[in-house]
């Protein structure tokens, strides 16, 4: 963001939150020019630059016995209630965990609130745990959990000089370098 502001001081960069379910449609419909997306995503008609893999974490009530460990493995989750939401991006299941007696919650925020009440645990990418952090929950890295791959994506037919400039910044080009 800072590099963009330095190079393009007259062009505001607006961050628009997208769900995994709507990320591709937002790009194709032109609602956004470029997006950070979670993979997998249908790549047809899109340009993608893989950026990084996000570490999975177990979100738990702050007083959970699981919080005594620095990191966890799937085996550590046996006997826990594994809470998922409809916008769950990992679809993680662990042997020995149980599903709650209630329907899947609507959002990740709902799942974290339910975890805070001591009902169970949730597994999600670290950025989502940080986004929905509360004083009454904590999280630990899940060593053998699934990563969430993040990429930069834009409509291949709708590249503009501003999109090219942003891609250049992401790729580490200097202000004076060219493609």
Report residues per predicted region:
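Flexible hinge/capping segments at coil-to-helix
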Residues: 48-56, 60-82, 164
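A ligand-binding cleft/hinge motif common to bilobed small-molecule-binding domains
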Residues: 24, 28, 37-44, 92-95, ...
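Short loop/turn segments at beta->alpha junctions
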Residues: 19, 73, 106-107, 125
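Short beta-strand-centered segments that line the small-molecule binding cleft or hinge
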Residues: 3, 7, 19-56, 136-140
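Secondary-structure junction motif
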Residues: 67-106, 112-113, 160
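Short secondary-structure boundary segments
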Residues: 39-40, 62, 86, 125-128, ...
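N-terminal hydrophobic or amphipathic helices and topogenic motifs
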Residues: 1-14, 31, 168-179
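A late-sequence structural motif
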Residues: 140-179
């Amino acid at each position: 963001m800072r590099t963009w502001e330095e190079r393009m001081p007259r062009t505001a960069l607006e961050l628009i939150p997208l769900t995994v379910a709507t990320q591709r449609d937002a790009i194709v419909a032109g609602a956004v020019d470029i997006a950070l997306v979670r993979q997998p995503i249908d790549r047809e008609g899109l340009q993608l630059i893989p950026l990084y893999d996000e570490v999975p974490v177990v979100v738990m009530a702050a007083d959970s016995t699981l919080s005594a460990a620095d990191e966890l493995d799937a085996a550590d989750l046996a006997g826990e209630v594994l809470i998922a939401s409809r916008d769950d991006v990992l679809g993680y299941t662990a042997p020995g965990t149980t599903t709650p007696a209630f329907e899947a919650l609507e959002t990740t925020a709902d799942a974290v609130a339910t975890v805070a009440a001591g009902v169970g645990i949730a597994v999600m990418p670290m950025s989502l745990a940080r986004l929905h952090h509360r004083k009454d929950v904590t999280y630990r890295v899940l060593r053998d959990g699934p990563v969430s791959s993040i990429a930069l994506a834009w409509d291949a037919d709708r590249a503009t000089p501003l999109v090219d400039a942003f891609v250049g910044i992401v790729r580490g080009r200097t202000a004076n370098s060219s493609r």
